[in-house]
Every structure is written in C-alpha cells, then in structure tokens.
Amino acid sequence: MRTKWFVFFAIAVTLIVFGRLVETPSLSKSAVVLGIGIDYDESEETFEVSTQAVLVGSSSGDTSQTSFVCTSAKGGTIAGALDVIARKMGLIISLSHCNVVFVSTAALKLDHMQLVYPLTGMYAWSEQTIFVTGNKSPSEMLSLRIGTTISSPFFLQQALVNEEGSDGMIRTTAKDFLARSLSRSKSNVIPYIVA
C-alpha cells in the first residue's frame, strides 16, 4: 500500500516539476499564421509555401501594434519550407489559428496525405481549416486585399462559413478534404477563387 502511494506521489511531483520547466512562448515570440499557401514545382520537385501571419509587437505605453506579414520559402517538404519561414522571421510558427489553405492545382495532384499530415501532426493545424484553390498562385492570393479586410484568409473564411449553401457555395475543411481523399471514389470538391 505504501509503495502505491509513493509511486503516485513520485508521478505527481514529476509532472509538476516538468510542467513548470516547459517554456510556453509569448505572443511576441510567435507568428500566428492566418493563411497558408502551398504550391508545387514539378520540374524542381520542391514546395513553395507562403504564409500570412499576424505579428504582435509592443509599442509605446500599454498599446500593442499588430501587423500582417506575407512570407514565402521553398523546400523539399512542406515542413522544411515552414522551417525556412520560421528562420526568416525569427519566430515560432503557430498554425493553430490558420483559417484558410490556398492550394495550387499542381499541389492538388500530389498525394493528399503528403499535404495534410505534416501540418496536422507537427504544427497543431486545425481540422476546420478551409481548403481553396484559384486562378493565381497561392502567394499572390495571400497577399491580395479582398473585401474590406486586410487579411484575405480571414475574409474568405467568413464568406465561406456565412454564405455556405447559398449560390452553390461550398466549404471543404481539412477534415472533409482528407476523408474524401481516402474514400473509395478519391474525389474532392473545393472552392475555386477567381481574383
């Protein structure tokens, strides 16, 4: 009986100590990504990944300054390109608030697990992220100013969520995209944005 309590106490102490030692980065050290663009160059076999991130910085007094930054990088994998972006920015990338993923038609021809799994497994990507494609490259789509907002991913997310079903508008989340890709038919429908 005493050994059971000792083991329980040792586990509790270990969890408390290591829970205090793990550093949680502040918002000023993180790049909160709102939208990500994935393009694939078939000739070089590289991914070009673009992100639109919100950078929160402090300014004079108690006010904080927010800016939107678009950054692109190439890599052999999506995770490799995101690592290059993190080094360029000097910040930790967080995809937990990513609203929209712009995927080029060349990237859609690849294995869909190769597109989705690195983001969900390594970067805590939300399953409710919306997939879209369009007539422009993903980096151009991210840098566009659409509607009345500064952030095109935020505007598109609001439009697709609020207007779903009207005028034939559809919304395909990352969860739906992967489920349909792994189904027997292996067919997907995602919104095509013309800007």
Locate each region found by the language model.
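Membrane-proximal alpha-helical signals and transmembrane carboxylates
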Residues: 1-195
